[in-house]
A protein has these predicted regions:
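Bacterial N-terminal signal peptides
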Residues: 37-48
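Bacterial signal peptide processing site
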Residues: 51-53
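A short, structured surface patch at a secondary-structure boundary
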Residues: 72, 91-157, 162, 260, ...
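Extracytoplasmic substrate-binding proteins
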Residues: 72, 82, 161-240, 261-263, ...
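Short helices/loops that flank or line small-molecule/ion binding pockets
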Residues: 139-148, 168-169, 271-280
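His/Asp/Glu-enriched short active-site or ligand-binding loop at hydrolase and phosphoryl-transfer sites
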Residues: 244-268, 288, 317-318
Length: 372
């Protein structure tokens, strides 16, 4: 070796390295053939020694090869529970449609083996093994276990009783399901890391942020006093709406509307007809997948509702029930539907994406898509 730093893991070759017994004693009486044999032996010895790493046992953490060493991934779910993975999950069961859609959106759809009966998007999700309905009572634990899952994704707010039973079977279970746009971004990263698709998750987030900006860039130019009062009917019996802490309430605000229940302290409060009448919304929005599909006739039959501005002016709109009811990537499609229905002139020049086919339906108008 010549020039540069010497490697500490290699023998250093020099004339001083030769054993004393191997050196010539200067005697001319030794036969030439003997000296040649000794010289040949030393040449071979030093050639091997100079190319053999110095064994340092203290620097070797184990006898395992680098391929045997597994990296541990740590995830913290919505309940603050820590879940550790030494391998990327390949047999995932999702108990929420929004979670299922998010997994497909980040490229982890082929790692799913089971989902609920309500997981209907994308179409590939309908081919997964059904593990029951979305409610706690409707979920089949036996079916889930038969799929030999290495990860179960449940709802943090309604599936908590499932956690302990599956933990007893040593099945990792994470409590997820966001309820704001910011939480959706966080969950995309969480699931991206857990499934080995973190880069795709960040890419999805950036695309969603750009689209939100494109859809809402005009909102700040509308004075608060000119924004339309909106009521979103989550359910009819009992009458429920969306508060500001819910992603639906967030969409109303992003879409330039004033939620008449912006003072609600819970996500989906029960309300009375009298309060709705008193706050007199200019816009009424509801999911198309209502228990009984909303119509002007139904609203007008409610006591006093025929006096509400939105009913009198026929400003009642149905929004795609799946998109508007799931805090997932398609919630931005629902946001666009809302804006197109309420402020139809605002999106003409601001969208960065190809416009979707709007599925919002003005209640009372003739439109076969109302039953989609």
């Amino acid at each position: 070796m010549s020039g540069g730093a010497q490697s500490p893991f290699l023998f250093k070759c020099s004339s001083q390295s030769a054993p004393r017994w191997a050196k010539s004693n200067g005697s001319e009486s030794q036969p030439i053939s003997v000296r040649l044999h000794i010289l040949f032996f030393l040449t071979i010895l030093f050639a091997v020694g100079c190319n053999k790493p110095l064994p340092l046992p203290s620097l070797s953490p184990s006898n395992k090869s680098s391929e045997d060493v597994k990296t541990e991934t740590i995830a913290v779910d919505r309940l603050g529970r820590t879940i550790r993975f030494t391998e990327v999950p390949q047999r995932i069961v999702s108990l929420s449609p929004s979670t299922t859609e998010l997994l497909y959106a980040i490229g982890a759809g082929n790692q799913l083996v089971g989902a609920t009966e309500h997981c209907n998007y994308p179409p590939a999700a309908t081919r997964l093994t059904r593990v029951g309905g979305g409610t706690l009572q409707g979920i089949s634990r036996e079916t889930i276990l038969s799929l030999n899952p290495d990860l179960i994704l449940c709802k943090w707010d309604s599936h908590q009783p499932l956690i302990e039973p599956f933990e007893r079977f040593k099945v990792p279970i994470m409590a997820v399901c966001p309820d704001t746009l910011a939480e959706l971004y966080e969950e995309a990263v969480l699931l991206g890391r857990a499934t080995g698709h973190e880069l795709e998750a960040h890419d999805l987030i950036e695309k969603m942020k750009r689209r939100v900006l494109a859809l809402t860039s005009w909102v700040d130019s509308v004075p608060m006093e000119k924004r339309r009062r909106a009521f979103y009917e989550v359910w009819d019996e009992p009458l429920m709406t969306a508060g500001p802490k819910s992603f639906i309430g967030e969409m109303l605000e992003l879409g330039g509307m004033k939620n008449i229940f912006a003072d609600a302290t819970v996500r989906y409060p029960r309300i009375s007809d009298e309060v709705v009448l008193d706050r007199d919304p200019q816009i009424i929005l509801a999911p198309s997948t209502h228990r009984s599909q909303l119509s002007l006739e139904i609203l007008a039959k409610r006591q006093g509702w025929d006096r509400i501005t939105a009913v009198r002016e026929r400003q009642v709109f149905l929004i795609d029930g799946d998109q508007v009811s799931r805090c997932g990537p398609r919630m931005l499609d629902a946001l666009e539907e809302m804006i197109r229905a309420v402020y139809p002139d605002k999106l003409a020049n601001v969208l960065e994406k190809e416009p979707i086919d709007s599925k919002s339906v003005r209640v009372g108008d003739s439109n076969e898509d109302a039953n989609r």
